[in-house]
Amino acid sequence: MNIEEMKKIAAKEALKFIEDDMVIGLGTGSTTAYFIRLLGDMIKKGEVSDIVGVPTSYQSRLLAIESGIPVATLDQVDAIDVAVDGADEVDPNLNLIKGRGAALTMEKIIESRAGMFIVLVDERKLVDYLCQKMPVPIEVIPQAWRAIVEELSIFNAEAKLRMGVNKDGPVITDNGNFIIDAKFPRIDDPLDMEIELNTIPGVVENGIFADIADIVIVGTKEGVKTLER
C-alpha cells in the first residue's frame, strides 16, 4: 500500500463519525482533501443530509464547494460538531505539529472549538517527540519576522522565513501574514512550548496543537488503526 492509499483509507474511516445535521470543520492539506471529496460523494448519494462545512482555508473552501458541500464561516454557525484535519507530526500523547499548508491559525480556532477533533495521517507522521522530523510553523506579523527569528535563537531553534513556491517572495497566509519555520532540538513539553511561543510579540499563532486531538486515524501498510486520547 502506497502513501496515497494510506491517506485515502484514513479519510474513509473518518466518514464513520459523520451523521446528519452536523457542522463539520474542514481542515487543509492532501489527506483532508480526500475526506472532503468523500464527504461530498456521501452528500450526493443521499447517505448523509443537512451537512454544513466550515473550511479552515480558501483551498478547503474551494474544494468543498466543488465537492457539493454547503459551506459557512465560523461566525455563521453556533457550534462545530466535529473537525477533521491532517497533521505533520503526531507524538505518543497525540500532540501535533500542523501548518505546512500555512492555515494553522484558522485551523486552531476551528478545531479547538469542535466537539470532536479527528486527525488523519499516514504512518510516516507518527514520531517519538514533536520536532523529530518537521519544524514548527509560526504565523507572524510581516514586519516582525526578523525580530522573531532572532528571539527564537533563545530556544536553540533553527528558524527561517518560508519562501513561496511558484511565486517570488515569502509565503503569504490567508490572513496576510508570513510563516517562520522553526526547528527545535526536540519538544518534550508541547503545551508549555505552545503557550510560550505565543507570548512573543508579533506571533499570531504557532503550529503546536497540544491536548486538542481526540482521535487520530492512521493509514498504515496493514490497514487503518485508530488512536484515542
UniProtKB/Swiss-Prot annotation:
GO terms for cellular component: cytosol. GO terms for molecular function: ribose-5-phosphate isomerase activity. Gene3D superfamilies: 3.30.70.260, 3.40.50.1360. Keywords: Isomerase. It is an enzyme of class 5 (isomerase). GO terms for biological process: D-ribose metabolic process; pentose-phosphate shunt, non-oxidative branch. Pathway: Carbohydrate degradation; pentose phosphate pathway; D-ribose 5-phosphate from D-ribulose 5-phosphate (non-oxidative stage): step 1/1. CDD domains: RPI_A (cd01398). The keyword Mitochondrion does not apply. It catalyses: aldehydo-D-ribose 5-phosphate = D-ribulose 5-phosphate. Substrate binds at residues 28-31, 85-88, 98-101, 125. The active site is at residue 107. It comes from the Archaea. PANTHER family: RIBOSE-5-PHOSPHATE ISOMERASE. Homodimer. Catalyzes the reversible conversion of ribose-5-phosphate to ribulose 5-phosphate. Belongs to the ribose 5-phosphate isomerase family. This is Ribose-5-phosphate isomerase A. It comes from Pyrococcus abyssi (strain GE5 / Orsay). The lineage of its organism: Archaea, Methanobacteriati, Methanobacteriota, Thermococci, Thermococcales.
